[in-house]
From Swiss-Prot:
Protein name per Swiss-Prot or TrEMBL: Tyrosine--tRNA ligase
Pfam families registered for this protein in UniProt: tRNA-synt_1b
Designated gene of the protein: tyrS
Catalyses which reaction(s): tRNA(Tyr) + L-tyrosine + ATP = L-tyrosyl-tRNA(Tyr) + AMP + diphosphate + H(+)
Role, per record: Catalyzes the attachment of tyrosine to tRNA(Tyr) in a two-step reaction: tyrosine is first activated by ATP to form Tyr-AMP and then transferred to the acceptor end of tRNA(Tyr).
Domain S4 RNA-binding: 348-413
Highest rank taxon of the organism: Bacteria
InterPro entries named in the record: aa-tRNA-synth_Ic, Rossmann-like_a/b/a_fold, S4_RNA-bd_sf, Tyr-tRNA-ligase, Tyr-tRNA-ligase_bac-type, Tyr-tRNA-ligase_bac_1
Biological processes, Gene Ontology terms: tyrosyl-tRNA aminoacylation
Main location: cytoplasm
């Protein structure tokens, strides 16, 4: 697809682009002038996780291409909860929890984007500023009358709940009106013309565009990214040990690096496009590496992704430490335990490995060790007592380091001919 706008061309070539309400007109506009665009994040946790990383990278690219991003922190809409993609109602958060989450998310976002008063500097805006002041009767008369309940019932966030006979509260039913109204407020306050979100937000985004048309505002645009899935079809952002948070205090930079280092071979090229800023020509060379060489591409992916999230020095330090761990034979003096490759391929539980290797006397003591956060594989804490080792844990190497506490370590070596 040939696009005039450098920003839209970048989204398309790197694999972000899903659909747009009027791509031709938006392309024309963005090729001629600085466009103000917004992405919203509800404040449901103290940090964002990598499920939000595509949107965060798009905020960076908006700045790099000379456009102005608005980050809308939904400290108002969080009081209701977005039903999109949810099988049941979200737990309502207290005002103090929402405030704490808002501050935490702001801290995370400021690592990725430049905020300020410059032409392409990001604005951080809070929708409680206008939602908390709404007069309900006026809102229904001026905004609610433009929405068809018949149409609202066709959106997946509503339709799927009703088809499954799952409760959808009137509170949640109002969410799409409030998100549409956010777009109107941002247009009137800041001349924002574009809303960007994940593909699950398409219905809500279209509502905002249509509301702008009915209110006779300048043309508004909506654009969505693909849903972030791994090559196995799983949602990205979670591991057996929990969410991959972007806050270094909630998920260590070393674990973050290791997460990207352990991605499947099939995901390397796509993730290099989405989560690094490397040139496409370099990415094409890296994704064409075969066999053991693909591990070099994974290290580059891990280091670049960690650099963007946690900074250059931290990323380089982790990459250097990983080099020592995996390539400098620092574990030559550790006791060795051999496991059969076929057993790992079937899924060897860490509990069983701890017992058969002699590191723990019984299954119960092995489970206690894990529950006490005393078990590590390659210095990454194992939190799930049901965790099973796979070849991914070996990171293309012939062994892993199994640790029990700070002083007991074992070199677990992979053997294919046992």
């Amino acid at each position: 697809m040939k696009l005039k706008s450098g920003f839209l061309g970048l989204l398309y070539s790197r694999g972000y682009f899903n659909q747009c309400t009027d791509l031709a007109e938006l392309d024309q506009l963005m090729s001629k002038e600085c466009v103000i665009a917004y992405i919203g994040f509800d404040c449901t946790a103290r940090s964002l996780h990598i499920g939000s990383l595509m949107q965060i990278m798009i905020l960076r690219y908006l700045q790099k291409c000379g456009h102005k991003p608005i980050v809308l922190l939904g400290n108002g809409t969080t009081k209701i909860g977005d039903p999109s993609g949810k099988d049941k109602s979200r737990t309502l958060l207290s005002s103090s929890d929402i405030q704490e989450n808002t501050l935490g998310i702001r801290k995370v976002l400021e690592k990725f984007i430049v905020c300020g008063d410059g032409v392409s500097d990001a604005l951080l805006v809070y929708n409680a500023e206008w939602l908390d002041k709404l007069n309900y009767i006026d809102f229904l008369r001026n905004i609610g009358r433009h929405f068809s309940v018949n149409n609202m019932l066709t959106f997946d966030s509503v339709k799927l709940r009703l088809e499954r006979e799952q409760n959808l509260s009137f509170l949640e039913f109002n969410y799409m009106l409030l998100q549409a109204y956010d777009f109107i407020e941002l247009n009137q306050r800041y001349n924002c013309l574009l809303q960007i979100g994940g593909s699950d937000q398409w219905g809500n985004i279209v509502n905002g565009v249509e509301l702008g048309r009915k209110l006779k505002l300048p043309q508004l645009f909506g654009l969505t990214t693909h849903l972030l899935l791994t090559s196995t079809g799983e949602k990205m952002g979670k591991t057996a040990n929990g969410a991959v948070w972007l806050d270094g205090e909630m998920y260590s930079p070393a674990d973050y690096w290791q997460y990207f280092r352990n991605v499947k071979d099939e995901d390397v090229g796509r993730f290099l496009r989405l989560f690094t800023e490397l040139p496409l020509t370099e990415i094409e060379k890296l994704e064409n590496l075969k066999g053991y060489e693909i591990n070099e591409a994974k290290k580059i992916l891990a280091t670049e992704a960690t650099r963007i999230c946690h900074g250059e020095k931290i990323a380089q330090d982790i990459a250097y430490d990983a080099l020592k761990v995996f390539e400098c034979n620092d574990h030559s003096g550790l006791p060795v335990f051999y496991v059969c490759k076929s057993e790992i391929e079937l899924g060897l539980s860490v509990v069983k490995l701890l017992q058969v290797s002699g590191m723990e006397k019984s299954n119960s003591s092995a489970k206690r060790l894990i529950n006490d956060k005393g078990c590590k594989i390659n210095d990454i804490i194992i939190l799930d007592v049901n965790y099973k080792l796979s070849l991914q844990d070996f990171c293309g190497m012939s062994y892993i380091k199994l640790s029990c506490g700070k002083k007991r370590h074992l070199k677990v070596v992979l053997e294919s001919n046992l």
